[in-house]
Regions:
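N-terminal binding-site loop/beta-alpha segment at the start of enzyme catalytic domains
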Residues: 4-90
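Beta/alpha (TIM)-barrel catalytic core signal, keyed to glycine-rich beta->alpha loops juxtaposed to Asp/Glu
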Residues: 9, 130-280
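Short, well-ordered coil/turn segments that N-cap beta-strands
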Residues: 20-25, 57-60, 85-90, 119-123, ...
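A short acidic, helix-capping loop that chelates divalent metal ions and anchors anionic groups
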Residues: 31-37, 99-101, 217-218, 259-262
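Short, acidic/polar
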Residues: 39-53, 102-117, 138, 165-166, ...
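A short, structured active-site edge motif that brings together acidic residues
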Residues: 87-100, 124-128, 182-183
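CE4/NodB-like, metal-dependent polysaccharide N-deacetylase domain
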Residues: 106-126, 145-149, 171
Length: 280
């Protein structure tokens, strides 16, 4: 797919998995509509950011019932409707919160998310965080039902370490699509604990949230040198490092249209083996 940013046309890179084409760079919706609670005073700012992202060519939007107490979902759905685009052209991820993992709660929360999004189905539904003492089999019984009923098309998890991820794979009646975790150049926790390798070996996407640690990218001389060599920003190098890895996608967030465009363009960058090795 070609994406036009300003006067330049870029070719977006995708991960192809289970007959899906998922963009390497998606749009994270944390802070859209507020943070832990809804902040309608910021709706104009949030809607402007979503409109800009859609106009730039973003198609994957990642939200959650826990983002702004569900208001983020409402604004994402509104932005898609107001853009006048086909529902099939966007890929919507949302998440059920860890306090809602009992069977009936999962079903109820999915219905609430669908209502807030004003959509007939969710493309990807994640367990947002594992909960101590949760009955994962009970949770997946509900999730599998949602897939069978057509309310959810794909299932995934978030913040699952290897043992729990393996359990989730066994419990899901359909191929588990992703484990969404914190992953970046300075944060290799899920590479060190085996999750990244397991995902790459088992056709599961690792979705990297918090992909850019701003304090790190601004002060890292190796990143600065690579950015200068490519004529881009250090943030774009950090995103390109993720986008080049097989079975890895990422979901940076920005309200700033220029930064949104820069993030999208990062998927075009090709880093050399030498540059990648320099990042450790």
């Amino acid at each position: 797919m070609r994406v036009k940013v300003g006067a330049i046309i870029y070719r977006m890179r995708y991960e192809t998995i289970h007959n899906l084409h998922i963009p390497k760079i998606g749009y994270g919706c944390w802070q859209i509509g507020g943070q832990r609670s809804a902040d309608p005073a910021d709706d104009d700012k949030s809607m402007a950011a979503l409109r800009s992202a859609l106009e730039l060519g973003y198609t994957h939007f990642d939200t959650a019932e826990g983002y702004a107490a569900g208001h983020s979902e409402e604004l994402v759905g509104r932005a898609v409707r107001e853009a006048g685009i086909s529902r099939e052209t966007v890929f919507i991820t949302t998440k059920v919160s860890p306090e809602h993992l009992k069977y009936d709660d999962v079903l109820r929360c999915c219905e609430n998310s669908l209502r807030r999004l004003a959509m007939e189905y969710i493309d990807l539904y994640l367990i947002h965080w594992p909960m101590i003492g949760m009955n994962l089999a009970e949770t997946f019984k509900a999730l599998n039902r949602l897939v069978r009923e057509g309310k959810v098309r794909h299932l995934g998890v978030s913040n699952f370490k290897l043992r729990l991820l393996q359990q989730a794979v066994k419990l899901s009646e359909t191929p588990l699509l992703t484990d969404q975790v914190s992953y970046s150049i300075p944060d290799r926790t899920y590479a060190k604990n085996g999750v990244l390798e397991y995902c790459q070996q088992n056709d599961i996407l690792l979705t990297a949230y918090s992909p850019v640690k701003r304090r790190f990218v601004r002060g890292n001389k190796t990143l600065q040198a690579a950015a200068q060599a490519h004529g881009v920003t250090t943030q774009q190098i950090a995103l390109a490092w993720l986008a080049m890895q097989p079975r890895v996608i990422t979901i940076p967030m920005s309200f700033n249209p220029q930064h949104q465009a820069d993030n999208l363009q990062a998927a075009e960058l090709i880093l050399s083996d030498t540059e990648i090795a320099m990042f450790g």
